[in-house]
Amino acid sequence: DYSSIQYRRLNTRKGPAVQATRIQADRNLYKSYIRGIIGNSKNLTILQRTIDSILVKNNKIYGVKTNFGEEIYSKTIIMTPGTFPNGLIHMGDKKNSAGRIGEPPTVEISNSFKELGLDVGRLKTGTPPRLDKNSINWKETEIQLPDSDPSFFSYQTKTIANIQLPCHITYTNERTHQIIKENLKDSPLFSGEIKGIGPRYCPSIEDKIVKFADKNRHQIFLEPEGLNTNEIYPNGISTSLPINVQLKIVNSIKGLENAAVIRPGYAVEYDYCNPQDLKLSLESKIIENLFLAGQINGTTGYEEAAAQGLIAGINAARKCENKEEFILNRKESYIGILIDDLITLGVDEPYRMFTSRAEHRLLLRDDNADMRLTQLGYDLGLVNDSDYNSFLDKKMDYEKFIEYYATKKISPNKENKKIFKDLGLNELKKQYSLKELLRRENINFDTLNLISKDIEILKNKNLINLLENEIKYEGYISRQLDDATKIEKFKNIKIPKNLDISFISGLSNELKQKILRVRPTTLGQASRISGITPAALNILMIYIKKNEIEKNLI
């Protein structure tokens, strides 16, 4: 909230399970705020060093060695090296060792991991060229305004902190695509220079042109980097083509005909460690007391990295205090889904989180995030008293209004019938509770406030969203909770390696093919295959048990 320069609610035309608030953050404001928090934290010493190796004895880490030869000892260590392990930057036929442009990689740490038996692989990500905002013809682009009444991320935020800036949209065109096709020979992605696999869901522009040859344009979001910078981030044209080609690509796009490239785009290859070698706490199974988080675990994206850093930090601290691991499960958080996917399924490309990865995403809406997780955070010592008291107040109001809406009745008297008719609603033929009325598709809280003057009016927007979604989708939410409970019972049942599922009646051929392709080792893993239902899991469980009985009879 402190660094936001644009709030925007996403997927507002879709259901609440896939809606979310996105902010465009001012990089400098965000950085200075975080530095302030870190700098003012008690018992925290900040050192700027390069780590050359980790110190291990009897498969247990006890410290790190810096590039200055210093040895720093600790009971637990968290490593979040990003794209720096063996980082290699590509721009056309030019390549140089770096974790980020202008910053050297960490080579020794990768070698250290390999020597200690960690399974090290190679991935790739990329970044677009940065543009000068003063060289863009904004009139030729589509404006995307910020929300005028946004939802904040923190209880403490009462007002918008900064001037809100618009983003803009433009598109590639056939000329752009032609330039890219003519220069694919100079792309390290297609010449074989880049060995690492890139992210499927945010590919480079050259990758898009090849993979989606039928598309005659691709969307580009022109995003401001901050309030006091001229840099624009053209989200959608990540590239590793030579700089002269990048300029041609940019200048072929509507509104960017005269745009100046401040910094070129590039691809970066880096080492990562197989996340299947981690526990759910993000502690290594191979090296005790070593915790890994972020791109080193095969993920891509800021939120994905932050989520892992949080869990690794919690568990590293708890291990120092000999406390049990803190694990979030799949039905209570996206963090739980992210980590469970990484550890049970592994990665063969950079992993990004989507709502579609959640089996029970109606339980994981952003309007109920505080209801799901604040108590856990407070118990861990991560939520301050002020925020916790705000949460308790909201929870108390929620329980009060759920009860109120279930018991407050609207009668079919003459006045109410007229109101319903004037609002274009179906005729009120009998007495209904407010809760029953709110379940109707065309009735929301604003409608209820018009229907009856003596209804207790709610003013807390976040609580209104929570109540409305919990009431409107109560049946679906209840069903997903039941499904999650059933899957919990199944999850540890092992699937025999040689189980022949081709004869299972009740499973579609499509599901059989998916199971054969993924080859899950437990029903818990099978439950995460797209399209698998609790009913299908039940059929699979019955078949496994039948198979075991038949084996015992032989």
List where the protein language model places each region.
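Glycine-/small-residue-rich beta->alpha transition segments that form the dinucleotide
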Residues: T76, P81-P85, L241-P242, K254
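Core beta-strand elements of the Rossmann-like FAD/NAD(P) dinucleotide-binding domain
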Residues: N67-T76
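A glycine-rich dinucleotide-binding beta-alpha-beta segment and adjacent secondary-structure elements
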Residues: Y233-T299, I327-D340, N462-K514, R519
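Internal hydrophobic alpha-helix adjacent to the cofactor/substrate pocket in enzyme cavities
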Residues: A305-F326
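Conserved N-terminal/central alpha/beta ligand/cofactor-binding core
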Residues: D1-S53, T80-S97, P104, E108-S110, ...
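Glycine-rich phosphate/pyrophosphate-binding beta-alpha loops
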Residues: Q295-E303, E359-R361
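An anion/pyrophosphate-binding glycine-rich loop and adjacent beta-alpha core
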Residues: N111-L247, G255, T344-K417, L425-E441
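Extended, charge-enriched "interface" segments that sit outside catalytic cores
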Residues: R357, T374-A536, L540-I554
